């Protein structure tokens, strides 16, 4: 039985989610929660090694999905599940919704295969709250171009990101009980006001 809460941050590259992750962590700390901040792919020593491979090496789309879930299984076993059992609040920069969006939407991998992997790797674990930061593709691209050297996903064409974004929004419609879609074109102050209200709701 888990006693902590599991929050995930999602969105296409350039959506601005990482800007607000630390803000939510700080809000929870103010509420006297013990917070574990982590990311996918990654979160463990093995996961971080797989992250480097996944972000920079070309591979078959099924290999990519399998490695994502391999890193996730280790992440759950070593970080997420123990933290929740302790009563901690876990905030993860991406989780399984990202695999459905990027590998399912962007790469066109059969959704049934992803469903099977999800049921194998974490049949009883879902986020309590998923914050989906949504922006138009041109805004996301402009933000990416202004930042840093891009990884292989960030270098994908507009069609890839359109399909990835569409799958994210489909997931949000499928699981409205845990998703909040955040309009990430607004000011940081406006977004943080919304996040403050959402956090208050989940911690009520």
UniProtKB/Swiss-Prot annotation:
Highest taxon in the source lineage: Bacteria
InterPro entries xref list: P-loop_NTPase (IPR027417), Thymidylate_kin-like_dom (IPR039430), Thymidylate_kinase (IPR018094)
GO cellular component, one term: cytosol
EC number: 2.7.4.9
Claim: Lipoprotein is one of the keywords in the record: no
Keywords: ATP-binding, Kinase, Nucleotide biosynthesis, Nucleotide-binding, Transferase
Catalytic reaction list: dTMP + ATP = dTDP + ADP
Classification via CDD domains: TMPK
Binding site for ATP: 11-18
Enzyme class: transferase
An example Gene Ontology molecular-function term: ATP binding
Biological process terms in GO annotation: dTDP biosynthetic process; dTTP biosynthetic process; dUDP biosynthetic process
The protein's role, per its UniProt record: Phosphorylation of dTMP to form dTDP in both de novo and salvage pathways of dTTP synthesis.
Family to which this protein belongs: Belongs to the thymidylate kinase family.
Protein's name in the database: Thymidylate kinase
Organism of origin: Janthinobacterium sp. (strain Marseille) (Minibacterium massiliensis)
């Amino acid at each position: 039985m888990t006693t902590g809460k599991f929050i995930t941050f999602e969105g296409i590259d350039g959506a601005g989610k990482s800007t607000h992750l630390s803000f939510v962590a700080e809000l929870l700390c103010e509420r006297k929660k013990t917070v574990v901040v982590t990311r996918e792919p990654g979160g463990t020593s093995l996961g971080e090694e797989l992250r480097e491979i996944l972000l920079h090496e070309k591979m078959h789309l099924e290999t990519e999905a399998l490695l994502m879930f391999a890193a996730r299984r280790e992440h759950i076993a070593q970080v997420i599940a123990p933290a929740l059992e302790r009563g901690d609040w876990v905030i993860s920069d991406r989780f399984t919704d990202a695999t459905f969006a990027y590998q399912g939407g962007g790469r066109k991998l059969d959704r049934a295969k992803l469903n099977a992997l999800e049921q194998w790797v974490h049949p009883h674990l879902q986020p309590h709250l998923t914050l989906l930061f949504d922006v138009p593709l041109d805004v996301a691209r402009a933000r990416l171009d202004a930042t840093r050297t891009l990884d292989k996903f960030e270098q994908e064409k507009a069609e890839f990101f359109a399909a990835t974004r569409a799958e994210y929004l489909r997931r949000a419609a499928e699981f409205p009980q845990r998703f909040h879609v955040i309009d990430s074109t607004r000011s940081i102050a406006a977004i943080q006001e919304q996040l403050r209200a959402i956090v208050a709701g989940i911690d009520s």
